[in-house]
Each structure stands twice: as structure tokens, then as C-alpha cells.
């Protein structure tokens, strides 16, 4: 009897341990799965950002050069002429100058942005359903705008110092008297000569521009997708899935709307980033004279001086290469993001 009691006790103990082990596995299964999904989502966002920016790097550099060009010492009269000039004077590498820094910035920026949007969307949707009492409620375009803007501000703020020095690296040429040797050297030089606040010059117009630019990109794209799936015009949807061409079109439309609304703020941001730089007076001026030092006391002052000395049209300098590059750039980013997530087996998407 004693031996049987011992066996029963041992059996019960083993059973208890097995049950505890099973419960432990079940307890960590969901968080572990969620963590893997998050990592895959971050990776997909990084790949999307890097691929899309590299594809349009020459147009991106041309846009920035036109935005900050000295109106009294015009070197680039247009997009085509500017690209030819860069090819002739700097070669193939000149067309991609600053792209390495841009990729170093855009990969974490895109990863954080896409991930933040998904988390913000889930949080906002949860609160919206709790408030309305409707468990089947979906995000409205306005709520998507809020989620997109939140994601954009978080991502932009986290990587802004890299964007600031990227702007200067992109603008400098082989003839610039003082050369930044790379992103690390540029960051160190700005910190030493201009102080840490200099790394966030132009941050305010960037934050303001995030709302219409990133917010509209996401909300327009997602709203178009939902409408197409629901209405299926011209048979564009197959098995409740959009084709790659349809996704590309949605991304292109979303990108065009966002960049058109926010573009003047982007011009002012770039000009403010040049303040305090030794080469700035040779690139762009704030007082309307080619030899004047570039000085803006803030965003409003930058707007005022730009319009006063160069006219309202100066706020749209570089719009042509930006329009050409932003459509494929945004479209490729969205499509690449979802395709990479499909390959990695991530179940939730931006639209979920």
C-alpha cells in the first residue's frame, strides 16, 4: 500500500510538473510569437525604406540642391540640366551622394514609422471600439490620419540628427572648401562647432509637415485599399486581395497628395539645416545677397526672408524632381513592405 501511495504521489507530481510546463509554454507562446512578428514587421519596414530611397537617390539629391540653391549664383536651372551637370562634374557617384547616409537614416526611420503606425492604429482602434461600444468598428480616415501623424513624428524625431547632416552631405560638392568625410564626421563636426541644438535645426517645420505628409500618405492609401476591396471597380480585386499594380497606384496617389500639401515646409526645413554651416553662404542666402551669411531666427523668419527675396515660387523649388521621385518612392515602399511581410509570414498588415 505504501509503495502504491508513493507511486500515486510521484505520478501526481509528474502530472503537475507536466501541466505547469504546458501552462508556461502557453503563457510565453503568444508574447514570443508577437515579438517575432514585431521583429519581422520592423525588418520589412527597413527594407521598404532602403529600397525605395535608393531607387530615386539621384532625384532626391537634385531636389535638395534646387531647394537650397543660391538665387544669385544659379548652377542648376532645372532637373534634367542639373542631373547632366552632376554627371559631367562628379560622375556616377555624384548622383548618389548622400544616399548612404539616407539609407542609414531611412532604414530605422521606416522601420519605426511602419511599426509605430501599426501599434498606434491598434491602440486607437481599441479605444474607439471601447468608446462606441461597437466591437466591429473600424478606423475612420480621420483616425488613420492621427495614427499616421503619430508614427511620423516618432520616427522623424528619433532620426532627425541624421537627416540634418544628410542634407549637408548631399549639398556639398567636390569643390566645397570644407568637406564632411561621412555621417560620423559630420555629426561630430556639427556638435563641436555648432552645438547639439544645431542637430535639430528645422525640426519644427518637419513636425508640422508630418501631419499632412505622413498622415495623408497612410490614410489615403489605406482608405483607397478599403474602398477597392469593398467596391471592386473594374475587377481590380482578386480573392479580396489587391494586385501589385493596384497597390502601386494607391501608393502613388497617396504620395502625391501628401507631398503637395507639405512641400513648402520641406523647403524651409532644408534651408534652416544650412544655418551655421561654413559653406552655407556659397549655397543659399537669407538676406538676398550672394555674399551674405545665411541666418534665420526661426521658421517664420525663414518663410519671410525666402518669400521676400525670392518670391512665393521659391517655396516650391525642387518640386519637379520631388514629384517625379515621390510617386515611385512611396509606392515602392508600401508594396515592398507588404511583400516582405508576406514572404516572412507576418499575418497582420497595415490595413488590419
From Swiss-Prot:
Keywords for the protein's UniProt record, in alphabetical order: Antiport, Membrane, Mitochondrion, Mitochondrion inner membrane, Repeat, Transmembrane, Transmembrane helix, Transport
Tissue specificity: Expressed in seedling radicles and roots, vasculature of cotyledons, leaf primordia, leaves and sepals.
Observed phenotype of the null mutant: Reduced root growth and respiration.
TM regions (residue ranges): 41-61, 100-120, 145-162, 202-221, 242-263, 324-340
Modes of activity regulation: Inhibited by pyridoxal 5-phosphate, bathophenanthroline, mersalyl, p-hydroxymercuribenzoate and tannic acid.
GO cellular component entries: mitochondrial inner membrane
Subcellular locations according to the entry: Mitochondrion inner membrane
Main location: mitochondrion
PROSITE patterns for the chain: SOLCAR
Membrane topology: Multi-pass membrane protein
GO molecular function, one term: antiporter activity
Gene3D superfamilies linked to this entry: Mitochondrial carrier domain (1.50.40.10)
Superkingdom of the organism of origin: Eukaryota
Claim: Transmembrane helix is one of the keywords in the record: yes
Solcar repeats: 36-123, 139-227, 242-343
Protein purpose: Mitochondrial adenylate carrier that catalyzes specifically the transport of ATP, ADP and AMP by a counter-exchange mechanism across the inner mitochondrial membrane. Substrate preference in reconstituted proteoliposomes is ATP > AMP > ADP. May play a role in oxidative phosphorylation and be important for the provision of energy required to support growth in heterotrophic tissues.
Family the UniProt entry places it in: Belongs to the mitochondrial carrier (TC 2.A.29) family.
Protein name: Mitochondrial adenine nucleotide transporter ADNT1
Chain's gene name: ADNT1
Amino acid at each position: 500500500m505504501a509503495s502504491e501511495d508513493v507511486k500515486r504521489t510521484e505520478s501526481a507530481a509528474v502530472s503537475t510538473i507536466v501541466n505547469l510546463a504546458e501552462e508556461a509554454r502557453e503563457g510565453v507562446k503568444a508574447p514570443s510569437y508577437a515579438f517575432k512578428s514585431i521583429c519581422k514587421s520592423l525588418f520589412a519596414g527597413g527594407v521598404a525604406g532602403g529600397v525605395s530611397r535608393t531607387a530615386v537617390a539621384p532625384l532626391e539629391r537634385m531636389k535638395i540642391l534646387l531647394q537650397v540653391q543660391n538665387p544669385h549664383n544659379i548652377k542648376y536651372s532645372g532637373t534634367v540640366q542639373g542631373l547632366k551637370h552632376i554627371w559631367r562634374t562628379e560622375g556616377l557617384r555624384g548622383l548618389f551622394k548622400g544616399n548612404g547616409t539616407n539609407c542609414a537614416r531611412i532604414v530605422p526611420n521606416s522601420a519605426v514609422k511602419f511599426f509605430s503606425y501599426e501599434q498606434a492604429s491598434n491602440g486607437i482602434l481599441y479605444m474607439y471600439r471601447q468608446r462606441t461600444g461597437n466591437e466591429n468598428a473600424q478606423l475612420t480616415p480621420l483616425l488613420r490620419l492621427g495614427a499616421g501623424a503619430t508614427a511620423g513624428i516618432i520616427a522623424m524625431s528619433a532620426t532627425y540628427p541624421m537627416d540634418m547632416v544628410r542634407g549637408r552631405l548631399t549639398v556639398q560638392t567636390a569643390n566645397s572648401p570644407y568637406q564632411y568625410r561621412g555621417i560620423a564626421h559630420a555629426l561630430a563636426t556639427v556638435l563641436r562647432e555648432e552645438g547639439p541644438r544645431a542637430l535639430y535645426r528645422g525640426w519644427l517645420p518637419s513636425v508640422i509637415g508630418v501631419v499632412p505628409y505622413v498622415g495623408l500618405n497612410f490614410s489615403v492609401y489605406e482608405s483607397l485599399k478599403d474602398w477597392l476591396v469593398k467596391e471592386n471597380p473594374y475587377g481590380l480585386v482578386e480573392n479580396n486581395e489587391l494586385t501589385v499594380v493596384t497597390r502601386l497606384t494607391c501608393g502613388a496617389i497617396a504620395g502625391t497628395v501628401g507631398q503637395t500639401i507639405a512641400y513648402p515646409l520641406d523647403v524651409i526645413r532644408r534651408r534652416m539645416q544650412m544655418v551655421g554651416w561654413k559653406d552655407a553662404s556659397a549655397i543659399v542666402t537669407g538676406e538676398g545677397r550672394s555674399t551674405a551669411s545665411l541666418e534665420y531666427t526661426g521658421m517664420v523668419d525663414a518663410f519671410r526672408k525666402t518669400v521676400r527675396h525670392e518670391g512665393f515660387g521659391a517655396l516650391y523649388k525642387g518640386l519637379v524632381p520631388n514629384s517625379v521621385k515621390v510617386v515611385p518612392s512611396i509606392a515602392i515602399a508600401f508594396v515592398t513592405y507588404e511583400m516582405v511581410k508576406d514572404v516572412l509570414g507576418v499575418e497582420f498588415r497595415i490595413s488590419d
